[in-house]
Swiss-Prot record:
A divalent metal cation binds at residues 97-98, 202. Endonuclease that specifically degrades the RNA of RNA-DNA hybrids. The gene is rnhC. One of its GO terms (biological process) is mismatch repair. This is Ribonuclease HIII. CDD domains: RNase_HII_bacteria_HIII_like, RNAse_HIII_N. It comes from the Bacteria. One of its GO terms (molecular function) is RNA binding. Gene3D superfamilies: Ribonuclease H-like superfamily/Ribonuclease H, TATA-Binding Protein. It comes from Listeria innocua serovar 6a (strain ATCC BAA-680 / CLIP 11262).
């Protein structure tokens, strides 16, 4: 089926919505403001001001509207390297963040999430903000409310896979880059034909290093990608991604604790060594490896405790 997509101004979008009202469809896809069906063509208008025409008459129908549009204006100059565009917090953005990288137990968990300007008031009302000071119960409560309404993708690198990749010479930065890139790609596919105005990654490596890590990937997301530390405070999309990632991490943690029969602690401090030693004593080193990042110093410390 042929697809034609045009970008219109807000007034044209409203005019189209009224024009197609007699042909309107009751069900709207995510991000749509109207949907209609005429003989040989389906029309869907999105909040992003993109309008998609599908069907044998799609191109002809689209041309009727293209003829009414003012001339396209040239884009503003690109911003300086490392600087976010003006009014960035109000833009429609995919944000991505990760958790679990500093924890001996548990998987690295990455989430990419899309938040548009219209969704922001609701997300703020639901409690979405920088989650660093939040406790797990609050994280879980908010995540369960926002996951049905926020387009997102969560990817986990389970401990056995993590250990395998690490032994093959891959560092954490490389693993995170792969997960971020794929999670963002997944969200872009979910949103199509809508495109975000920007993508913001909570920075864990320099831009050049990040893309070097992805050099062998068949698909690399580069367009409109920005990197910033403390990105949770710069856009709600990163705050939402962080909350969802942590929720999934907590779920994985709870499942592992249930499986091994011991409450597993987060972090990588001395309290973690004691629990790891208990697992070695009860089940052996191989079992510990199923739930941990083996190259952490905690492994050797736990072995010493277990031998006492």
């Amino acid at each position: 089926m042929a697809n034609t997509v045009i970008i219109v101004d807000q007034s044209t979008l409203e005019k189209m919505k009224q024009t197609y009202l007699p042909f309107s469809s009751p069900k709207l896809p995510p991000g749509a403001v109207f949907a209609a069906k005429k003989p040989g063509v389906s029309i869907t208008g999105y909040k992003s001001r993109k309008v998609m025409f599908q069907g044998v008459n799609g191109e002809a129908e689209a041309k009727k509207w293209v003829a009414t549009l003012p001339e396209a204006k040239t884009k503003a100059p690109s911003v300086s390297k490392g600087v976010l565009p003006a009014n960035f917090a109000a833009k429609n953005v995919i944000g991505s963040d990760e958790v679990g990288t500093g924890d001996f137990f548990g998987p690295i968990t990455v989430c990419a999430a899309y938040v548009d300007a219209e969704m922001m008031p609701l997300l703020k009302e639901l409690g979405v903000k920088d989650s660093k000071a939040m406790k797990d119960p609050e994280i879980c409560r908010i995540a369960e409310k926002i996951m049905p309404i926020v387009p997102h993708s969560v990817l986990l690198c389970p401990n056995p896979k993590y250990n395998e990749l690490q032994k093959r010479g891959m560092n954490q930065g490389q693993m995170k880059a792969l997960l971020h890139n794929r999670a963002i790609e997944n969200v872009l596919k979910k949103l199509a034909p809508i495109k975000p105005e920007a993508i913001l990654i909570d920075q864990f490596a320099e831009k050049n290093t990040y893309y070097r890590y992805l050099a062998k990937e068949p698909s690399i997301i580069r367009e409109d990608v920005f990197f910033a530390t403390k990105a949770e405070g710069l856009h709600l999309s990163v705050a939402a991604a962080s909350i969802i990632a942590r929720y999934k991490f907590v779920q994985a943690f709870d499942a592992m604790s249930k499986e091994v029969g011991i409450p597993l602690p987060k972090g990588a401090g001395p309290h973690v060594d004691v629990v790891a030693a208990e697992i070695i004593e009860r089940f052996g080193l191989e079992t510990l490896a199923k739930y941990t990042k083996q190259h952490f110093a905690n492994t050797e410390k736990a072995l010493k405790i277990a031998k006492k």
